[in-house]
Amino acid sequence: MKLKPIEVAEILQKEIANINCLSELEEVGQVITVGDGIAQIYGLANVKSGEVVEFKSGVKGLVLNLENDSVGAVIMGDDNQVQQGDNVKRTKAVLEVPVGKALLGRVVDALGNPIDGKGDIASKEYRHIEMKAPGIIERTSVSEPVQTGIKAIDSLIPIGRGQRELIIGDRQTGKTAIAVDTIINQKQAHSLTNESDKIYCIYVAIGQKRSSVAQIVKKLEDAGAMDYTLIVSATASEAAALQFIAPYSACSMGEYFRDNGMHALIIYDDLSKHAVAYRQISLLLRRPPGREAYPGDVFYLHSRLLERAAKMSEEKGSGSLTALPIIETQAGDVSAYIPTNVISITDGQIFLESELFYKGVRPAVNVGISVSRVGSAAQIKAMKQVAGSVKLELAQFRELESFSQFGSDLDPATKAQIDHGKRLVEILKQAQYHPFPVEEQIVSIYVGTKKYLNDVPLQKVKEFEDKMLTEIRLNKKDILESIKNEQRITEETEQKLKAFLENFVKEFVK
C-alpha cells in the first residue's frame, strides 16, 4: 500500500501535535548569601519585583529588592531549608491566596493554608494579595451602619460600612476586646435571611502570641460566631515575611465579599507589629532607614492596605469592606511615627486610655479625643435622636470634674451636672463579650440622657439597667420592635417608653 506525500505529511503533523513537550525553559539563579529570613540571589536577570521564586527545597521566596548584580528575596518559611549555593527558579507568578465562602469558619496562615487541622479548603477562586484600591468613581459615600454592639461606640463614634476606623491605645486597654465584640454582635444579622444585613468578618493576627489567637478562636466558637468569620494568623514565631504579607492576603479574602455585593469587616490586630516586621525586612535588605529606623515607604505600606476598604457604588454591586486597624501606643504617645501615619490614613479613631481602664470605665473609650469622620451619616435616626447631646454632656462633665477637684463648694446646678455626668459614664459601661442590640442601646441611652437615673444611687445604675432591659424584653417588647423596625422613636413609642420608665423608676427606688 502506497501512501501519498500529503497523507504522510498529515500523519507526521498529528504525531508531532501529540508529543508532550517535556523540556521547559527555566530561569535559574543561585543563592549567594542567606540568613535572617533573607536570601541574596545571583543570576535571575529578568525577575520582577513582587515575583515568587522557588528554592531547591521547595520553600518559596518573595523578591523585594532588585540590585545591579543580585536580587534580594524574603523567605516565606523556614530559612534553615535554604543553603548557600542552592538553585533558585523563577515562577513568573505573583503571590495568590484562596478566597471565597469556603474559608469561613477556618483558621489559615498568611498564604491561605489551613492550620486548624480541619482538612483542606475547597476554594475554587484565587486572588493576588496586592490589588489596586477602587477608584473614586467606583465608590459611593458611607451610608449604612456597622453595629458594634458597644454603647459608647454606636452612640458617640458610629462606624459605617466601608469606613476605616482606627482602634488605638496602650497594651491591655481592651483594643482586641472591642474588635471581638463587634464580630460577636454580627451573629444576630446572620440569623436573618436577608443577605444585605449580613457582615462577614475577617480577623488578622499579626505578631500575636499563639495562645492569644487560640483564645480568640475559642471565644468566637463559644459565641457561635465562627460560622461567618475567618481568621488569618501570622504569629510572633513565624517569619517576618509572613507577618508582612498577612494583612494583604486577608484583605484580598475580604475583597471577594466586597466585589460580589456582600459586606465584610476586617480587623488588623495590629499594624504596629506589622510595621515592625516590615522594618526588620527593610533593614536586612539594606534599605536606608528613616525616622525611628522605619524605611521611607512605611506610610505607603499602610495606606495601600487601608485604601482597599471601600463602599462600592450600585453599578459595582453595592458591596463594602470595613477596616478596623489596631495600633498599640507606648505610654499613650499618639504622636509617634506609626500612630500619626495611621490616624491620617483612617476616617477616625477610637482612643482607649489606660487611666480610664484602671478606673473601671470599660470599654475605656476617651470620648473627648475619639472621632468618627464619616460614620455619623450611617447612624440610624433613633440613635441620633437620643445620642445627640451625650458627647457634649460628657465633655462638660469632664471639665467640671477636673475643675471641682480644686474647690469643695459647688453650687447646686454644677453638682447636679456632675451627678448626671457620672450616671452617663456609668450607663455607657459594658461587660466584655456582651454586645447589645441597637434598640436596647437606644433605650439605655434614652434613660441616661432624659435624667431618669437622677434618683437612682450611682452604684445601682448597672443593676437598674439590667433589670429595666429584662423587664422591657419580657413585657414591653412592642417598644423594642417599634424602634427596630421604624429605625426611629415615634411619638407613640416615646409616650409608651416614658410611661414605662416612670413606673419602673418608682418601683426600683422603693
UniProtKB/Swiss-Prot annotation:
Gene3D superfamilies xref list: 2.40.30.20, ATP synthase alpha/beta chain, C-terminal domain, P-loop containing nucleotide triphosphate hydrolases
Catalytic reaction list: ATP + H2O + 4 H(+)(in) = ADP + phosphate + 5 H(+)(out)
Pfam families for the chain: ATP-synt_ab, ATP-synt_ab_C, ATP-synt_ab_N
Gene Ontology MF: a single term: ADP binding
One GO cellular component term: plasma membrane
Subcellular localization: Cell inner membrane
E.C. numbers: 7.1.2.2
Membrane topology note: Peripheral membrane protein
Keywords: ATP synthesis, ATP-binding, Cell inner membrane, Cell membrane, CF(1), Hydrogen ion transport, Ion transport, Membrane, Nucleotide-binding, Translocase, Transport
CDD domains noted in UniProt: ATP-synt_F1_alpha_C, ATP-synt_F1_alpha_N, F1-ATPase_alpha_CD
Main localization of the protein described in the UniProt heading: membrane
The keyword Signal appears for this protein: no
Residues that coordinate or bind ATP: G169, D170, R171, Q172, T173, G174, K175, T176
InterPro entries: ATP_synth_asu-like_sf, ATP_synth_asu_C, ATP_synth_asu_C_sf, ATP_synth_F1_a_nt-bd_dom, ATP_synth_F1_asu, ATPase_a/bsu_AS, ATPase_F1/V1/A1_a/bsu_N, ATPase_F1/V1/A1_a/bsu_N_sf
Site keyed Required for activity: positions: S370
PANTHER family per the UniProt record, alphabetical: ATP SYNTHASE SUBUNIT ALPHA, MITOCHONDRIAL (PTHR48082:SF2)
Family label: Belongs to the ATPase alpha/beta chains family.
Subunit structure: F-type ATPases have 2 components, CF(1) - the catalytic core - and CF(0) - the membrane proton channel. CF(1) has five subunits: alpha(3), beta(3), gamma(1), delta(1), epsilon(1). CF(0) has three main subunits: a(1), b(2) and c(9-12). The alpha and beta chains form an alternating ring which encloses part of the gamma chain. CF(1) is attached to CF(0) by a central stalk formed by the gamma and epsilon chains, while a peripheral stalk is formed by the delta and b chains.
Function according to Swiss-Prot or TrEMBL: Produces ATP from ADP in the presence of a proton gradient across the membrane. The alpha chain is a regulatory subunit.
Protein name per the record: ATP synthase subunit alpha
